[in-house]
């Protein structure tokens, strides 16, 4: 499952052994470098989580592996490789497809972190004799009352705690996050100063197994599209959609609506999905009231510390990555989920995405958004 190349760092027999998840990017490169400088016995591991065999240019695994190997050679450390594609398919990708089939918009990166990077990778690193693992995520650790807390990264623009909220405390405690204490510009400067080949490499974006290809082209390989009509909230048919799974709430691009009689010349936005009728509901105007909601409920919450801070609490929350924290009142439900009521209505809150809860810089955990409503009108279960 793994092969090793390179040589171990000097003094590794007595120092704490750490295996760094090497992605071939600048963040994991500087993570390995920093830990070496701090005296750890560092080795790297490159994970292949997706088997790309269609001969396209979309999968960058070979290029990323080459970059990871080049960095490890420069640092003089071992690079292991491991193929976790089967585990990824079973524990992440099948859930991804099931959610889209059900009309929701999932976030596979969150599940990948919980199931692969901080579970399968951690277990594999233990097999290799590691005491800890490390990743290039922009988050920090903190300890309070004997518990390891997940904290936001120092660089607010790069903070990735949203994606790590479902990782349990025991895994957070076993992981080092050196770049979480740095600004992104500092990370690149360190890599440049030490001659690392990844210093100017572009950050990866989007879902790893889709790459730069069109999302609809990828998804239709696995799920048959079911075209239908686009309606206004009043029931007027104004267009056709390619399949509900290709659209998300608040979306403007790709609707193909324009020049309609008796309607102003203003952009249209996805407001809801009627799953039973296979109808997409669209409204005009970026700030149309139907695009906003002030309340939601979630599936059972993954609390980093294993339990909620209180049955009810005033907290801050994000409903999407890079959103500014918003104030809300949270109540824990009997099934382990939460009900959140925002101080101000939020735009395009999407079932299938995650509500992540914070107490200042502490990421408490989060859960998948199940339903949303505004005032007394639920709309999340049947109109995702």
Swiss-Prot record:
Known catalytic reactions: S-sulfanyl-L-cysteinyl-[protein] + uridine(34) in tRNA + AH2 + ATP = 2-thiouridine(34) in tRNA + L-cysteinyl-[protein] + A + AMP + diphosphate + H(+)
Pfam families (UniProt xref): tRNA_Me_trans, tRNA_Me_trans_C, tRNA_Me_trans_M
Protein's GO biological process: tRNA wobble position uridine thiolation
Catalytic residues (UniProt): 112, 208
Annotated site residues (Interaction with tRNA) in this chain: 137, 353
Subcellular location, record wording: Cytoplasm
Region (Interaction with target base in tRNA): 107-109
EC top class named in words: transferase
UniProt-annotated binding residues for ATP: 21-28, 47, 136
InterPro entries per record: MnmA-like (IPR004506), MnmA-like_C (IPR046885), MnmA-like_central (IPR046884), MnmA-like_central_sf (IPR023382), Rossmann-like_a/b/a_fold (IPR014729)
GO molecular function, one term: ATP binding
Regions that span the bilayer: none
Disulfide links within the chain: 112-208
Protein keywords: ATP-binding, Cytoplasm, Disulfide bond, Nucleotide-binding, RNA-binding, Transferase, tRNA processing, tRNA-binding
Region of interest (Interaction with tRNA), residue spans: 158-160, 320-321
EC number: 2.8.1.13
Gene Ontology cellular-component annotations: cytoplasm
Broad class of where this protein is predominantly found: cytoplasm
Family stated for the protein in its record: Belongs to the MnmA/TRMU family.
Function text: Catalyzes the 2-thiolation of uridine at the wobble position (U34) of tRNA, leading to the formation of s(2)U34.
PANTHER family linked: MITOCHONDRIAL TRNA-SPECIFIC 2-THIOURIDYLASE 1, TRNA 5-METHYLAMINOMETHYL-2-THIOURIDYLATE -METHYLTRANSFERASE
Name of this chain's protein: tRNA-specific 2-thiouridylase MnmA
Species, as recorded: Chromohalobacter salexigens (strain ATCC BAA-138 / DSM 3043 / CIP 106854 / NCIMB 13768 / 1H11)
Record gene name: mnmA
């Amino acid at each position: 499952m793994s092969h090793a190349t390179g040589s171990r760092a000097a003094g590794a027999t007595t120092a704490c052994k750490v295996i760094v998840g090497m992605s071939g990017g600048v963040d994991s490169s500087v993570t390995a470098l920093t830990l070496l400088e701090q005296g750890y016995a560092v080795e790297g591991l490159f994970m292949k989580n997706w088997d790309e065999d269609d001969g396209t240019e979309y999968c960058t695994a070979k290029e990323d592996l080459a970059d990871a190997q080049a960095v490890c050679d420069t640092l003089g450390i071992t690079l292991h490789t491991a193929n976790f594609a089967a585990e990824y398919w079973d524990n992440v990708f099948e859930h991804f497809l099931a959610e889209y089939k059900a009309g929701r918009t999932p976030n596979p990166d969150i599940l990948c972190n919980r199931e692969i990077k901080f579970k399968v990778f951690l277990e594999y690193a233990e097999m290799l004799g590691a005491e800890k693992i490390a990743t290039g995520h922009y988050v920090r650790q903190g300890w309070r009352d004997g518990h390891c807390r997940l904290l936001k990264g120092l660089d607010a623009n790069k903070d990735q705690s949203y994606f790590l909220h479902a990782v349990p405390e025991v895994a957070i405690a076993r992981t080092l996050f050196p770049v979480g204490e740095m600004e992104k510009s500092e990370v690149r400067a360190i890599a440049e100063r030490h001659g690392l080949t990844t210093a100017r490499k572009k950050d990866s974006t989007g879902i790893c197994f889709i790459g730069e290809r069109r999302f609809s082209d990828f998804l239709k390989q696995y799920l048959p599209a079911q075209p239908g009509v686009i309606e206004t909230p009043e029931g007027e048919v104004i267009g056709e959609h390619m399949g509900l799974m290709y659209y998300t709430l608040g979306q403007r691009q790709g609707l193909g609506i324009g020049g309609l009689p008796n309607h102003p010349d203003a952009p249209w936005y996805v407001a809801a999905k009627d799953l039973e009728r296979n109808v997409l509901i669209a409204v005009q105007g970026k700030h149309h009231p139907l695009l906003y909601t002030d309340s939601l409920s979630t599936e059972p919450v993954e609390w980093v510390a294993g339990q909620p801070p209180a049955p009810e609490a005033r907290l801050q929350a994000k409903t999407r990555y890079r959103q500014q924290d918003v104030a809300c009142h949270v109540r824990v439900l009997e099934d382990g989920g939460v009900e959140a009521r925002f101080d101000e209505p939020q735009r395009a809150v999407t079932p299938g995405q995650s509500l992540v809860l914070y107490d200042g810089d502490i990421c408490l955990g989060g859960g998948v958004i199940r339903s949303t409503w505004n005032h007394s009108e639920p709309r999340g279960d049947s109109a995702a």
